[in-house]
Amino acid sequence: MTNGISILPHTQPVYGDAAVAAMAERVVGALGPAVVSHAIAFGELTLVVQASDIVYALTYLRDDPACAFRNFIDICGVDYPQREKRFDVVYHLLSLRHNLRIRLKVQTDEVTPVPSVIEVFPAANWYERETYDLYGILFSGHPDLRRLLTDYGFEGHPLRKDFPLTGFVEVRYDQDQARVVYEPVQLTQEFRNFDFLSPWEGTDYVLPGDEKTSA
């Protein structure tokens, strides 16, 4: 221990897939039942974690010197409307010490909050606000969970799969009123179904004599 910093004993460095596999074994063993499942793909470890254990899991990954995932990269949401718990909340971390990345996922629905991780990584503040704004995912314990990217009075959450492509409200600047106005969306034409055969792809013509070839 030097100046309060733990110094790891010198070990032979491990690189590539072997390093990821070794990290997976260590992390899964340490977190135990908090880990629902794990997988290694494209040189990165992904953990699916119980939502109630996300603060515990991130604290361990940050503080254990053998992990040292101290760079908080991002939080994002993913929407799977067909699932009962339709949302994944995905956390991305980086360890500069070990040159490794790790991804944690938790699942939730539209009404069940996920614990905020601001106490572990203060940088999560705006990421959680962005995820709430775009997906409607709630974070319990967040000090200021309000919209971040969309406009005042915005209806809905635009990255949900069931959000209409046109939105609900059009925001534009009105020259006559010299101010921004909000109006219901007015389409210049009705939606059309373009699910037909493209003229560029051609069609299957049956010409005289083709039946001999098929025979």
Swiss-Prot record:
Origin superkingdom: Bacteria
Q: How does it sit in the membrane?
A: Peripheral membrane protein
The opening ranks of the lineage are: Bacteria, Pseudomonadati, Pseudomonadota, Alphaproteobacteria, Hyphomicrobiales
The UniProt catalytic activity note for this protein reads: a quinone + NADH + 5 H(+)(in) = a quinol + NAD(+) + 4 H(+)(out)
Q: Which GO terms describe its molecular function?
A: NADH dehydrogenase (ubiquinone) activity; NADH:ubiquinone reductase (non-electrogenic) activity; quinone binding
Q: Which UniProt keywords apply?
A: Cell inner membrane, Cell membrane, Membrane, NAD, Quinone, Translocase, Transport, Ubiquinone
For this protein, the Enzyme Commission number is 7.1.1.-
State what protein this is by name.
Answer: NADH-quinone oxidoreductase subunit C
Assembly and binders: NDH-1 is composed of 14 different subunits. Subunits NuoB, C, D, E, F, and G constitute the peripheral sector of the complex.
Q: Where in the cell is it found?
A: Cell inner membrane
Annotated Gene Ontology cellular components are: plasma membrane
Organism in which the protein naturally occurs: Methylobacterium radiotolerans (strain ATCC 27329 / DSM 1819 / JCM 2831 / NBRC 15690 / NCIMB 10815 / 0-1)
Q: What does this protein do?
A: NDH-1 shuttles electrons from NADH, via FMN and iron-sulfur (Fe-S) centers, to quinones in the respiratory chain. The immediate electron acceptor for the enzyme in this species is believed to be ubiquinone. Couples the redox reaction to proton translocation (for every two electrons transferred, four hydrogen ions are translocated across the cytoplasmic membrane), and thus conserves the redox energy in a proton gradient.
What broad class describes the main subcellular location of this protein?
Answer: membrane
Top enzyme class: translocase
Q: Which family does it belong to?
A: Belongs to the complex I 30 kDa subunit family.
PROSITE patterns, sorted: COMPLEX1_30K (PS00542)
